[in-house]
Amino acid sequence: TFEFLTGYADVYCVRYYKASGKISKHIEWMWVMFLDILFGYKDMKIINACIPLIKTNQYKGILCSTYRTFPLTAAKTLAIHTNLPFVVDLRDIIEQYASHEYISHKFHTFSWLDAFITKRFRKRLLRKRNNALEVADCVTTVSPWHVEVLKQYNPNVRLIYNGFDPELFYPQQIKTSRFIITYTGRLLSLAIRNPELLFAAIARLT
């Protein structure tokens, strides 16, 4: 994901998966998920990879940017272990979703069991996130609403709106015979991202 930074900063990759076959990849994914739920496997791998790097480099702080929870536990542990300033950047939070769109994979069990697992999973994610927020030196997020929600767990929450770096992206005027609107996000569900009103408005223009 961060390979584009190569050449500007040192980039290190922590890999969790090695399998290449379709079936073996699925089995490995299930095994890693099992280890992560029981023992925090993914966070431990990050911690073990980062401690030697921190010892041999002059880092000034730890920044963890995430949309859900992972890898906040690893970042929190490293910050406590090294006594470095700890900044958490939350672009999206679980509370903003209408349902369970924040879950990457459905559990595919019985409906009642799915509901039970999802409820427990959500509670676990929020507990781990909030534990990390409580020890953070600063929290940044993207809207006034997000700020108010996160201030329940850390009083030092700063607002930084989403945007783009003008040094990397230059606006251009491109002439075209078609009216083009580009949406670069994901339509996770109609409950929180419903484009029907936009389509209806455009239909009235044509």
Model region roles, listed by residue range:
Residues 50-71, 84-91:
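Short N-terminal targeting/anchoring amphipathic segment
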Residues 19-37, 57, 84-126:
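Acceptor-binding helix/loop patch of EC 2.4 sugar-transfer enzymes
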Residues 165-206:
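Conserved catalytic-core segment of nucleotide-activated headgroup transferases in glycan assembly
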Residues 60-61, 138, 180:
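Structural motif
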Residues 44, 48, 70, 77-81, ...:
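Membrane-proximal helix-turn-helix segments that form the acceptor-binding/catalytic region
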Residues 1-54:
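A conserved catalytic-core segment of Leloir-type glycosyltransferases
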Residues 142-145, 163:
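Carbohydrate-associated surface elements
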Residues 10, 137-138, 156:
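Well-ordered beta-strand positions
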